[in-house]
Amino acid sequence: MGVAQCHAQKSGSGLRHWEIASADPDRMFLTFHGDPASGRAITWRTAGDTKTLAYAEIAKASGNSTFAREAIRIEAKTEMLDLNVSKRNKQGTVNYHSAIFKDLDPDTLYAYRVGDGGKRWSEWIQFRTASREAKPFKFVFFGDAQNGILTHWSRTIRMAYQTAPDASFALHAGDLINKSHVDNEWAEWFKAGSFLHSQWTGVPVVGNHEYIGDTKAIKKDLSIQWRPQFTLPVDEDLPEELHETVYTVAYQGMQLILLNSNKLIAEQKPYLESQLKKPGFRWRVVAFHHSVFSPRRGISETSMAIEKRWRPLFEKYNVDMVLQGHDHAYTRGQVPIRGKAEFVKNTFQTMYVTSVSGPKQYPLNPKHMKTFGPRGLETIRNGEHTQFFQVIGADGDKLNYRAYATTGELYDEATITKNFKTGKKKITQEIPDVKERVFPSKSGDKKGKK
């Protein structure tokens, strides 16, 4: 969480009731903090003129309401956020509160709530801590939400919940909104996800639209809401401007590394390698916003920087999966093992996925996708003009990947099987009998802003 100065309070005139901060907690967002087996962080919002202290309470959940008698109360940290940096915002200052849950028992169901310590509390919400063993688990993945968030992205995240209600966490690959500082867009994002943002542990990745302000904003800087509303891990070895945008989660045998592909790509390389060097993980997954293999833009300055700085480490440390967004289309491909002079045929090392979960869509560009082969990527499955979400599950020596359309239709599937002693892998394609959603008449080299 960051600190912001406050100015005169605006009235909130013209806003919908669920956009306006009040004395009641809203915009609750659960994140990892420290070891997922023993810690979490929760962040929420109240009105800027709310003067009372803020608290979180937590207890081991039970089948009846008596668990609440055993709840431990934690005083929250509070900061005021000035929304006046954008003249499109119709509220002045709001409060953001954060509390850290520590020393929890592993693989245990907990219930928590947040409030003022008096009459204004949230409902009790449950989550389960991670196991210290490599037990099977799954998580959901979302490419860009960005536009039409409440009207259209809401059905994607809700269908994901119907499909995988027991998911351990939700990974958002950037461009959660369109205009970084505009608060009504964040209001839509929180309303679209509703209780899921406080029940699923969230893993947000920063995208370029978290850096794009509106025309009246003072700066095109990181969204003023990002750090106040997401309490994320901080690595002091990283430059301060990367704090809470670059971090790592270790979950039940999986190492999940979240990077910031918007800036300081070279500066993140030492951090990335320091994390990948850590032993003891069965699976390694890396996520960031911009695509290495862009099905829309082809080779860009950003993709070249990632390919030069990060991709060699993906190969050196045998990364299993790379998850990305940005291109508003779908493609899944795979890269073989690189030999001394060339790629080794009939081998598999890393799966690359680019996806989109919101309604903004771009056509695939066959011209740019022709650059994939010489760079080592074999494209397996493509899609366009479709909203997707993914369910990814680790179980023993298998890492299963499934892509669903927002209707719930299974669109793509593959399973990686790994020998943990040798690191050698094979991939099994399990693509369902569903026609590939590619529309040649709509594809081409049309230019469009991200």
Give short role names for the model-derived ranges.
Residues 2-141, 162-163, 385, 391-450:
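Acidic, histidine-bearing metal-coordination/catalytic regions of metal-dependent phosphoesterases
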Residues 37-41, 50-55, 64-67, 148-151, ...:
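Short, solvent-exposed loop/turn elements at domain surfaces
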Residues 49, 145-148, 176-179, 208-212, ...:
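Solvent-exposed loop/turn segments at secondary-structure junctions
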Residues 51, 95-101, 109-126, 184-280, ...:
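Extended active-site neighborhood of metal-dependent phosphoesterases/phosphodiesterases
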Residues 135-205, 210-211:
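Conserved, compact domain cores that house catalytic/ligand-binding motifs in diverse enzymes
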Residues 141-143, 169-175, 201-208, 259-260, ...:
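Active-site neighborhood of phospho(di)ester-bond hydrolases with catalytic His/Asp-centered motifs
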Residues 142-148, 173-185, 214, 255-264, ...:
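The substrate-binding groove and active-site-proximal loops of carbohydrate-active enzymes
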Residues 279-322, 342, 371-373, 438-439:
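Active-site-proximal segments of metal-dependent phosphoesterases and phosphodiesterases across multiple
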